[in-house]
Amino acid sequence: FYTGKIFDAYEFLGAHPDKDGTTFRTFAPAASRITVIGEFNDWQEWELNKTYDGNFWECYAKGAKPGMMYKYRIYRQDGNCVEHCDPYGFGMELRPNFASIIRDLSHYKFKDSKWMQKRSVCKDKPLNIYELHFGSFKKPYEKADDWYTYVEMIDILIPYLKENDYNYIEIMPLSEHPCDESWGYQNTG
């Protein structure tokens, strides 16, 4: 984990529901205390316990179900605390709010097997990478203060990328970030 080479940390960290509740697990080596607050406990603090090497925290919240919102309340060594979304959360509340949302991904089926088979065939071709910032690429004409969803963007973006011979996309931002005017370099998670 500490070398940055664990690519499936999302299977361990974050909120993982089962039939009776949800296991919450996060990495916070500098925290003195962490609690989880959410709809399942009327936003009252439930303690997370230090586990493993003392840098990970976890608790099981009976009754915490998919679709419910939650946040971590992280206490620093100086005694101050801050409410934080889950950096490994699978769902997020829309801005300006920042709660994470419990999601059950156990039934999700990836539909990219054709792409996965084809992707290794392109190693000898030149790269043409488009750095895409979703918030500034294009906005709906009829809703200038809003953004397209990822699904809505497909019919706009794919033809543009093909027309300009891009074969890779760097998507920014991938994580929730605190300021809509930024490019998303400062993740909230």
Language model region names:
Residues 1-23, 43, 51-131, 136-145, ...:
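The feature marks proteins involved in alpha-glucan
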Residues 128, 143-146, 177-189:
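Aromatic- and acidic-residue-enriched carbohydrate-binding clefts of CAZyme catalytic domains
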Residues 52, 155-177:
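Catalytic domains of carbohydrate-active enzymes, especially glycoside hydrolases
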Residues 30-31, 134-139, 175-177:
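Short, solvent-exposed loop/turn segments at secondary-structure junctions
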Residues 34-36, 70:
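Short beta-strand elements bearing conserved aromatic residues within extracellular beta-rich modules
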Residues 26, 72, 132, 161, ...:
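Conserved, mostly hydrophobic/aromatic
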Residues 37, 135, 172:
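Conserved residues at the C-terminal ends of beta-strands
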